[in-house]
């Protein structure tokens, strides 16, 4: 095996009250990550696609490069590699752009060098790259990027991830607004009132109950009622409260995707066209009608 091509999905984290815990994989958008063995030792990174020119190719500064370097060191891989990433997920979108690249590289290296790592191990490696983007390792995006479906990152030391396969249609809008992951974290409160904590724990628990009972109405209702993170981050996304009000009768639920500015909604199917039109009317932005999808998968092997 000389080369692998991996499809690495976009993801949506938090889903309202599940801050830093909940995440889902999306069928689109996605990155394509190709890893090829080369004679020259070291790691070469090239990029194309969404804002590729703004992403560093230096191994130490690139999220996927950090993952590759650590795996090569840990498994004493002697071959050089060329990583080529086609960015289909816009960086800074709130759709797990850096996570997709990290997950795609971890998944691809595991296949290319037959490392036989578990999905949980792949999440551990992929989360190391997130420290470059967010300042500390986070798994709420890389976990669904690896596992697919709906994931809960319930612990970090040791890392624990729970996986629930689900089939849910979603609409994701990507307003042309700049929101960095770091600034979106800095705006959050350092302390949370007990009342807000109780609200979020209750709503998050209710969302899991709703999943197991195929109750989209309840799932979306609770997804829309985060009392801690969304009220802060809504300030960073012009028009968010307006869009939430306009969509309230057309969707089961709507919330900010990850750090934003992406907005994710669970549509009532008869209103999909209306929802897309409202997003375009308010933001004039790309809108994806997609569904909860698979984790990383091999698209091609040579």
From Swiss-Prot:
Pathways involved: Amino-acid biosynthesis; L-threonine biosynthesis; L-threonine from L-aspartate: step 4/5
Superkingdom: Archaea
GO molecular function, one term: homoserine kinase activity
Entry binding sites for ATP: 90-100
A Pfam family annotated for this UniProt entry: GHMP_kinases_C
InterPro entries: GHMP_kinase_C_dom, GHMP_kinase_C_sf, GHMP_kinase_N_dom, GHMP_knse_ATP-bd_CS, Homoserine_kinase, Ribosomal_Su5_D2-typ_SF, Ribsml_uS5_D2-typ_fold_subgr
NCBIfam families: PRK01212.1-4, thrB
Protein name: Homoserine kinase
Organism of derivation: Methanococcus vannielii (strain ATCC 35089 / DSM 1224 / JCM 13029 / OCM 148 / SB)
Gene name, Swiss-Prot/TrEMBL: thrB
């Amino acid at each position: 095996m000389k080369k692998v091509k991996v499809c690495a999905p976009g993801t949506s984290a938090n889903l309202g009250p599940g801050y830093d815990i909940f995440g889902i994989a999306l069928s689109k958008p996605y990155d394509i990550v190709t890893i090829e063995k080369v004679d020259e030792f070291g790691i070469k990174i090239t990029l194309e696609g969404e804002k590729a020119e703004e992403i560093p190719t230096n191994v130490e500064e690139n999220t996927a490069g950090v993952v590759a370097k650590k795996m090569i060191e840990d498994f004493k891989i002697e071959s050089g590699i060329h990583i080529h990433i086609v960015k289909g997920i816009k960086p800074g979108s709130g759709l797990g752009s850096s996570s997709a690249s990290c997950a795609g590289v971890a998944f691809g290296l595991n296949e290319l060098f037959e490392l036989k790592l578990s999905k949980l191990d792949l999440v551990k490696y992929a989360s190391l790259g997130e420290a470059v983007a967010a300042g500390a390792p986070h798994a709420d995006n890389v976990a669904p990027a690896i596992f697919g479906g709906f994931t809960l990152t319930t612990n970090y030391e040791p890392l624990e991830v729970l996986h629930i396969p689900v089939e849910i249609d979603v609409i994701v809008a990507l307003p042309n607004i700049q929101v960095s992951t770091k600034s979106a974290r800095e705006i959050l409160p350092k302390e949370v009132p007990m009342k807000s904590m109780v609200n979020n724990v209750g709503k998050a628990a209710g969302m899991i109950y709703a999943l197991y009972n195929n109750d989209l109405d309840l799932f979306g209702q609770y997804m829309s009622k985060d009392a801690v993170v969304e009220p802060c981050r809504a300030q960073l996304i012009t028009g968010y409260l307006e869009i939430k009000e306009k969509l309230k009768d057309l969707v089961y639920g709507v919330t900010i995707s990850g750090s934003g500015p992406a907005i994710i909604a669970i549509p009532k199917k008869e209103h999909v066209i209306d929802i897309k039109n409202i997003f375009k009317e308010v933001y004039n932005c790309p809108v994806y009608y997609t569904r909860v999808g698979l984790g990383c998968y091999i698209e091609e092997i040579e």
